[in-house]
A protein has these predicted regions:
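Regulatory and interdomain segments flanking nucleotide-handling catalytic cores
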Residues: 1-302
Length: 302
């Protein structure tokens, strides 16, 4: 059958193309994925930080990093995930990183995102992926906390490893008397996605921006649980009041203070008794403040 479109089909396709933005090649792209109405979704969950939600967000980030082409770094805080995408030709690892922001490759040009850099299709795919995976991991995390075991037919092999590695830690931190609250939210979380190009030098600044927002959100959420009147008070004032109550914010786990990231690391693995190197996505819940550790960030994205 001929693929040639009729006049009607051509006209309909023109309507679609009018809004189908195409990203240029060889440019850094930021993907921002946000939960829909998460203040309502998490209304009856543990406050100020819910371990089940945090677990699902962190592992959703890792899944997206591993399954979206050209992803170099992931960062999550609250109900959002930020991904840094760029092609391998954008940077030359042999160069001194001081020159990193002025190197402009011209030898080859690769697609930055799927679907030939089409923003509309990529955004819909990324939002769908986040929604699917978060709901899956949210359910697994709830089972880790409230159930002694999970049916083998309900969990994939890689999820079994996740179960074994995290169930004891989750059970230690999470209140275990409200299982039905979580069951009521199974398969109901949704996410949106947006993408935008940034200059190379602003890759790091975008993550700094999101991390600074994470710190503000963390202080505010923590303070609202213990201080009656937080209106008009800045972060330093809230921290001082929390300290007077014996609840210093800066003693919270680092991931609750300023988020969690994901990046690739070389790990030594063994096959038939012989070691070999392999890149693996790892979750870092003790990431530093990027603004004060820019070299650390550059090392991770390269």
């Amino acid at each position: 059958m001929s693929k040639e479109l009729s006049p009607l089909g051509q006209r309909m396709k023109e309507y679609e193309k009018a809004y189908d933005f195409i990203f240029p090649n060889n440019v850094p792209i930021i993907v921002r994925i946000d939960g829909k109405n998460f203040s309502t979704y998490t209304k009856n969950f543990n406050k100020p930080f819910d371990d089940i939600v945090t677990f699902a967000m962190v592992h959703t980030m890792k899944y997206l990093c591993a399954n979206i082409s050209n992803c170099r770094f992931g960062y999550t805080q609250s109900d959002e995930i930020t991904l840094v995408l760029f092609e391998k030709t954008l940077f030359d690892k042999e160069n001194d990183y001081k020159d990193i922001f002025i190197k402009t490759p011209y030898e080859s040009f690769e697609k930055s995102v799927p679907f030939n850099n089409r923003a509309m299709k990529s955004n819909s795919l990324f939002a769908s992926m986040a929604t699917m995976v978060f709901n899956r991991y949210f359910k697994i995390a709830a089972h880790m906390v409230f159930c002694s075991e999970i049916n083998g037919s309900e969990i994939l092999p890689e999820e079994r490893e996740m179960w074994d590695n995290n169930k004891d830690e989750l059970r230690k931190w999470t209140c275990r008397d409200n299982y039905q609250t979580y069951v009521n939210k199974f398969d109901s979380a949704m996410f949106d996605s947006r993408m935008f190009v940034v200059p190379t030098f602003d890759i790091i600044n975008n993550i700094i921006f999101r991390q600074e927002d994470a710190i503000k959100n963390s202080i505010s959420a923590y303070a609202r649980c213990y201080i009656k009147d937080t209106d008009g008070k800045n972060g330093l004032q809230l921290q001082e009041e929390l300290k007077e109550l014996g609840l210093p914010w800066d003693e919270l786990p680092l991931f609750e203070q300023h988020g969690t990231c994901c990046y690739k690391e070389n790990v030594v693995m063994f096959r038939n008794g012989k070691p070999f190197n392999r890149e693996k996505w790892v979750i870092d819940k003790e990431m530093p403040i990027i603004k004060d550790n820019k070299e650390w960030f550059l090392e991770k994205i390269l």
